[in-house]
Regions:
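Short alpha-helical "recognition helix" segments of helix-turn-helix
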Residues: 22-23
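A short, Lys/Arg-rich alpha-helix, primarily the initiator
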Residues: 1-18
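Short, basic-rich loop-to-helix N-cap that marks the start of a DNA-contacting helix
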Residues: 39-52
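Short, charged recognition helix plus adjacent turn
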Residues: 2, 10, 63-72
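Recognition helix of helix-turn-helix/homeodomain-like DNA-binding domains
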Residues: 28-42
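DNA major-groove recognition helix of helix-turn-helix
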Residues: 37, 54, 65
């Protein structure tokens, strides 16, 4: 499954939030922040924390991309 967190980082830019300060306020660690930056999977707990902090829905911070074999 390919995931993109580009929406999250655009939202952070739009709100003037720095990644490291955001992670600290949300309560996610540096490893989770690195995974988000690399579009790797993170725990649902982390996703929920982010959404609650930003007062948004899951679809506002991430999207699931079609797998290469799904694109026919």
């Amino acid at each position: 499954m390919d995931i993109s967190y580009n929406k999250l980082f655009k939202l952070l830019i739009d709100r003037g939030l720095k990644k490291t300060e955001f992670a600290k306020q949300v309560g996610i660690g540096g490893n989770t922040l690195a995974k988000l930056s690399k579009n790797e999977t993170v725990s649902m707990d982390s996703v929920v924390r982010i959404c609650r902090y930003l007062k948004c829905d899951v679809g506002d911070i991430m999207e699931i991309l079609p797998a290469d074999d799904d694109q026919q």
